[in-house]
């Protein structure tokens, strides 16, 4: 195992994720077929140098430097492998917009881990990368499906080990994700939540989660509809999203089975059958337009392959 050569390069593709899906707060997440691409290469310089090049206007506020999430994740790999850090450059084709509740930070973490690991010959297993990703992010619901793909339920067992269960999502269920021009940070969304919740609310969520998972497995719209209800976080977060209630109502009236805040928001997730997707998308965009917010609402599939890397020609 050796340090990467100057100019050695890998390309990492990492999917967007939608977390919580209503009742699965901080434990349920799904990968979507919308990818960020990170071209990472070693450059001249010491271990505190990281250069970031963003393709796309959404990332104009993002900066390089040693505190960048991509580089922080890369440093964790090198430390675990017993290697000294090196200078890196990352050129990012940004399709997953930051601060929209689609796991943008998770894509940065996973790319940094996977890219750095690939550059030094993959000394760390995927299980170790998963452990590092959760530790950096602080919660598993985005980084786990971002790395592994699919619909993932993640929980910390009594042994303190993270356990991941891959859940079924029938292909007939489509995800319409309405992505607004406004932003909402995860920290702000978390501050809106209470420190404690009633036991009755927790019980409702447990039941709803069971219904939702069975609905996603079978494609039963009634179960999805009954399952996409939450009492732990959404009652406190919808008020932070301008026009969010109207967008949700418009999606339901257009034929969606259920609606939820995607991650911490402000994007809104609607689940529906395939032939309803275009109508649900149009209705959500129109509702946000009426609230004075520009948006787009792609109809997306579950991404099942997770993140992957490939070598690229040295520069």
Swiss-Prot record:
Localization per Swiss-Prot or TrEMBL: Cytoplasm
Annotated signal peptide: none
The protein's Enzyme Commission number: 2.7.1.39
Main location: cytoplasm
CC terms in the record's Gene Ontology section: cytoplasm
SUPFAM superfamilies in UniProt: GHMP Kinase, C-terminal domain (SSF55060), Ribosomal protein S5 domain 2-like (SSF54211)
Catalytic activity entry: L-homoserine + ATP = O-phospho-L-homoserine + ADP + H(+)
Function: Catalyzes the ATP-dependent phosphorylation of L-homoserine to L-homoserine phosphate.
Classification via HAMAP family: Homoser_kinase
PANTHER family: HOMOSERINE KINASE (PTHR20861:SF1), HOMOSERINE/4-DIPHOSPHOCYTIDYL-2-C-METHYL-D-ERYTHRITOL KINASE (PTHR20861)
Family, per entry: Belongs to the GHMP kinase family. Homoserine kinase subfamily.
NCBIfam families hit by this protein: PRK01212.1-4, thrB
Name the record gives this protein: Homoserine kinase
Organism: Synechococcus sp. (strain CC9605)
């Amino acid at each position: 195992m050796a340090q990467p050569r100057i100019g050695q390069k890998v390309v990492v593709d990492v999917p967007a994720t939608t977390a919580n899906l209503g009742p699965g707060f901080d434990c349920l997440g799904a990968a979507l077929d919308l990818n960020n691409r990170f071209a990472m290469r070693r450059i001249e310089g010491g271990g505190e140098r990281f250069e970031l090049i963003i393709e796309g206007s959404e990332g104009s506020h993002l900066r390089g430097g040693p505190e960048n999430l991509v580089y922080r994740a890369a440093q964790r790999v090198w430390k675990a492998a017993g290697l000294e850090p090196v200078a890196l450059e990352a050129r990012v084709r940004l399709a997953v917009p930051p601060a929209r509740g689609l796991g943008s930070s998770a894509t940065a973490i996973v790319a940094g881990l996977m890219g750095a690991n690939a550059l030094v010959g993959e000394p760390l297993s995927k299980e170790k990368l998963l452990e590092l990703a959760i530790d950096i992010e602080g919660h598993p619901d985005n980084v786990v499906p971002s790395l592994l793909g699919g619909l993932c339920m993640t929980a910390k067992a009594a042994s303190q080990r993270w356990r991941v269960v891959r859940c079924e999502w029938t292909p007939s269920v489509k995800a319409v994700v309405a992505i607004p021009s406004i932003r909402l940070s995860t920290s702000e969304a978390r501050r809106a939540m209470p420190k404690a919740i009633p036991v009755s609310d927790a019980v409702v969520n447990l039941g709803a989660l069971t219904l939702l998972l069975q609905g996603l497995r079978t494609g039963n719209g009634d179960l999805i509809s009954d399952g996409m209800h939450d009492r732990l976080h959404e009652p406190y977060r919808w008020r932070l999203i301008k026009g969010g209630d109207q967008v949700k109502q418009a999606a339901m009236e257009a034929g969606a089975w259920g609606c939820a805040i995607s991650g911490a928001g402000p994007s809104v997730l609607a689940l529906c059958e395939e032939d309803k997707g275009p109508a649900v998308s149009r209705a959500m965009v129109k509702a946000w337009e009426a609230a004075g917010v520009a948006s787009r609402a792609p109809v997306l599939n579950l991404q099942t392959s997770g993140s992957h890397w490939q070598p690229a020609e040295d520069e």
